[in-house]
Amino acid sequence: IIENKWISPLPELEIIKIEGWQPNAWYDQTDIPWVPPSPNIPDLKTAIIYPGMCLFEGTNISEGRGTPNPFKWIGAPWIDGKKLSQTLNNFKLPGVVFVPKSFTPIPIPGKSENPKFKNQKCHGIEVWITDRDKYRSIDVGVLTLYSIYNMYPNKLKIRETGLNRLWGSNSLYEKLIRGVTAQDILKY
């Protein structure tokens, strides 16, 4: 912002060092109170899950908005949550297990006025972090999208520009439509 002179006049900034800061500490290991960065990221666990599961914002899958657990719960009316959770658990991703979850997104003022599948029962998964130091959010999101793409090719709709914007390029979308293996989809 400053380097590109987006604001005028340019402010004079002063860097203030934080005493006792440990860069590899989790937020809840500090004495800093949690302030949600978004209405749909109410807690630290959601913030940890969000980077991977936000990919579903570029699809017709509910990312859990309109529920108490956005991004922790994902699904659609046509998903078999038991099969999806089994598929994902078979990948044996570190620090996470997946459990079947059914939920009904509803409007929540100030958070989600018109969630995907509003007032419709959705089935899918809940992401349970078992070890946040080993959990890999992007791998979880990519393999979940990969699994749904392969399980429901005629039901899953991907908004290509939306997914590409979230991913930063078209490489994930291209790999999905080329039908790469699970191992190759994780090469990013």
Locate each region found by the language model.
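Conserved, well-structured core segments that form the ligand-binding/active-site neighborhood
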Residues: 1-19
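Noncatalytic linker/hinge segments flanking ATPase motor cores
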Residues: 3, 56-61, 169-171
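Short gly/pro-enriched beta-turn/loop segments at secondary-structure junctions
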Residues: 8-10, 64-69, 120-122
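Glycine-rich, aromatic-lined ligand/substrate-binding cores of catalytic
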Residues: 20-98, 105
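Conserved functional hotspot residues or short segments at active or partner-binding sites
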Residues: 75-187
